[in-house]
Every structure is written in C-alpha cells, then in structure tokens.
Amino acid sequence: MTLSFITRWRDELPETYTALSPTPLNNARLIWHNTELANTLSIPSSLFKNSAGVWGGENLLPGMSPLAQVYSGHQFGVWAGQLGDGRGILLGEQLLADGTTMDWHLKGAGLTPYSRMGDGRAVLRSTIRESLASEAMHYLGIPTTRALSIVTSDSPVYRETVESGAMLMRVAPSHLRFGHFEHFYYRREPEKVRQLADFAIRHYWSHLDDEEDKYRLWFTDVVARTASLIAQWQTVGFAHGVMNTDNMSLLGLTLDYGPFGFLDDYEPGFICNHSDHQGRYSFDNQPAVALWNLQRLAQTLSPFVAVDALNEALDSYQQVLLTHYGQRMRQKLGFMTEQKEDNALLNELFSLMARERSDYTRTFRMLSLTEQHSAASPLRDEFIDRAAFDDWFARYRGRLQQDEITDSERQQLMQSVNPALVLRNWLAQRAIEAAEKGDMTELHRLHEALRNPFSDRDDDYVSRPPDWGKRLEVSCSS
C-alpha cells in the first residue's frame, strides 16, 4: 500500500516554518518500532527492513515536504520569546483512509534555524523515555502523541556526558501548540493569529466552521480538552515536569515528554524536574498552571474574540476539571453513584497516604480487592498507623454498601481504572542503561508490558521501586 502525504501546513501557513531536510546520523540503525501503531497507520512492514531509512532522516517518502515550525512561549512563567523546532522536523502529514491526518515529526533530526544554542540532536536516553512514556499514556487511555520508531547511531552528542545520537519518529493528529499563537501575538501580527485559529477550526473543528461565533465555541472546547487532560494526569499520578506554553497541545494531547515522572510515594508537591527550583510544575500545581497557560492563549485571541467570551470559556475550566476528576476518582474508589461524603473520604485517604508516603499506584490497585462485607483488607499492611486506616476503611466499606453492585462487578470496574503498571522512572532507567550497552531486550520487554497496564502481574514491574530507583533526578536535557 502506498502512503499518502499532504502539505496543508506548508501550503496554508507559509510564515510559520522554514523548509529544510533532516541531517542523517552516522551509522544510524533502527532499534525499535511500534508494530501495532504501524499497522493502524497502514505502514508497510518493508519500510522497517531497510535499516534507518526514513526513520533516521536518510530519505523521504513520496509526498513528504519537511519543515521546522516556529513558535514562542512562556517558560517557567516568563516570556521566553522565539523558540520553535530546535531539533525536530515535521516530515509530512499522512492522509489516512478515514480522511483524518497524522503528523510525522522526526525528533533529533539536526540543526534548524530555531536551534538557538543547541546542536539539533536528541540522545538515546531521551528518545527511549519519550517512546515509553507516550505509549504508556496511550494504553492508560490518556490523550497523547505516539512513538513510531527509535534510531540510534555512532554519532556522539555532548550533554553532561558524551551520549549516542538518536532519532524518534513521533506522530500526532497535530503539533499545534499554544506557543504558535503566542509567537504572532507578541510580534503584533493578530491577522496571523487569526489565520492559525482558522486553520485549526477548518481542519480539527470543522463542525464549527460555519458557526457565527465559531471562535468562542472553539476556544471553549480547547479549554475543555485541556481541563479533561489535566484531570486524567492527576488521577494516574502523572507529573509532566515542564508545562511551558510551548509544550501545550491545542488538541489536548500530552506533548513533549522531558523530565516527567509518575508518582511513587504519594507526595502532592512532587517535583520531577530538577531544574524546577520553585516547584512551579509540581504535581499538585498542574491544574493551576494549565489554567494560567490557557489565559495566555486567550490573550492572543483577544484582538478578534470578545474578552467576555474568552473569560466565560476560562471560567468553565474549573468545573470541567472537577467533573472529570471527580468521575474518575469515584471509579477508582469503586463508587457507582455520587454521594456527599465522597470528597471527604477521598481527601482523608490522601491525607493518610501523604503522611505515610504510601505508593500511589499500589494503594489504589490493592483497594480494588476490597470486599465490602469483610473488615479485612490487603491494603491494611501497607499502613503503619493501622488505627487510622481501620477508621477510614470502616467508613469506606459503609459507603460501598450504598451502591447496589456486587463485589466482583465493583472490583472489575476498579481494576479497569486503577493500573497495576505505570512507567516508573526506574523502569525506564533500567531499559535505558541496557540499551546504551547495546542490549535492547528490556526496551522491547517493557514496551510490551506497558500495552496492558490494567492486567495483574507478579514481576518487579509492579513492585515498589528499589532504593536506587526512588526520586531519580531528571532534567530537560535531551
């Protein structure tokens, strides 16, 4: 089957990019590709048999028209000016059989006009982390970009140490960012901001294109998508680590995996980015930061959208967030209905977990085994303060009895939303260290495991992290 690529971005937004081709690596070789995703995108298996090829930027497929996008943004709350694709190149937009499209974006593809002081490269460590994280999030049911392939090489890349240059093929319906809008707003070119909005609506919100107040309706949906995404992050214990406005997806996708981390111990103020000295992007601050970022996006639209309409959309954020979060947390607790004591029970559990540094993922997974008519709980042994746990658990069992559902039905529901497996940093690090020595076995094994996060396991993928794996420091270096 011949793949079809179109050039909407290149044709319709000529002032938002620089056309250029990838710069290949030395002795590049394909070490992993996503068979399931490739099948979904109807990519012939033969494309994965010619070593690096398109996956390493050595050649292009017919119809591809590569370009690097320009955007700007606020980083750690401060205006950073022009940024852009400093090491990534959009190779093309694949047209799928159902009429939708998928960007092919090659990360680590070499210098671009937006590289600033960088070298345009990515390292094996960061490409492995992003591939694992994006696929983990996908199988958790959370909107995200996807990883299609990883290429490593003999090209040295200089970070804190000398590392192997690598490339990641990332795919997504769109790479539209809040930062695209900010770029032209701060250049005082509101007509180009409007062109971006029209492009987004025309291709991704086409049902709104003929509406008289299409910009208000569109921005309201952007707010809702963002709120829903953040709610889902919070329920699985995911910390993004670098929620700059240029890393915010207009479509509500998890974008740009850098110093991310899933909670091990339940620590509300968890900071996964060792460069985040003030804790701006801490786990519990993510909902507030997302709203702040939406406010920055709203500002860019103010030249052609009524401020009252923008504020009305922003005001809806909190309720959408709380609705999605509340629904998912009730499912995680096994509640079939909404009762007034639910929030208090959840907050008391969180207080217990925070005091005892309980493992976030294991706690909710073990809670899924609760039998409402039994005073015993496998979770009890996880707590030092047994009396406090017993008090909470008695009230929790009482709450369960308010819903007309069998234990087996409730347990099945809870196990479908409480994963046994998340991508803990130590698991990723183990795969990275093996890969850096030339052994890709653990990389492939972990990718396969992450496809079934809600299945019971009895291996170390679902155990507490070893001492060396706790609080691994991760930076933005990639």
Swiss-Prot record:
Coiled coil: none annotated. GO terms for molecular function: AMPylase activity; ATP binding; magnesium ion binding. The keyword Protein biosynthesis does not apply. The keyword Metal-binding applies. The active site is at residue 246. Its EC number is 2.7.7.-, 2.7.7.108. It is an enzyme of class 2 (transferase). ATP binds at residues 84, 86-87, 107, 119-120, 170, 177, 256. InterPro entries: adnlytase_SelO, SelO. Mg(2+) binds at residues 247, 256. Keywords: ATP-binding, Magnesium, Manganese, Metal-binding, Nucleotide-binding, Nucleotidyltransferase, Transferase. Its cofactor is Mg(2+); Mn(2+). It catalyses: L-seryl-[protein] + ATP = 3-O-(5'-adenylyl)-L-seryl-[protein] + diphosphate; L-threonyl-[protein] + ATP = 3-O-(5'-adenylyl)-L-threonyl-[protein] + diphosphate; L-tyrosyl-[protein] + ATP = O-(5'-adenylyl)-L-tyrosyl-[protein] + diphosphate; L-histidyl-[protein] + UTP = N(tele)-(5'-uridylyl)-L-histidyl-[protein] + diphosphate. Belongs to the SELO family. Nucleotidyltransferase involved in the post-translational modification of proteins. It can catalyze the addition of adenosine monophosphate (AMP) or uridine monophosphate (UMP) to a protein, resulting in modifications known as AMPylation and UMPylation. This is Protein nucleotidyltransferase YdiU. It comes from Escherichia coli O6:K15:H31 (strain 536 / UPEC).
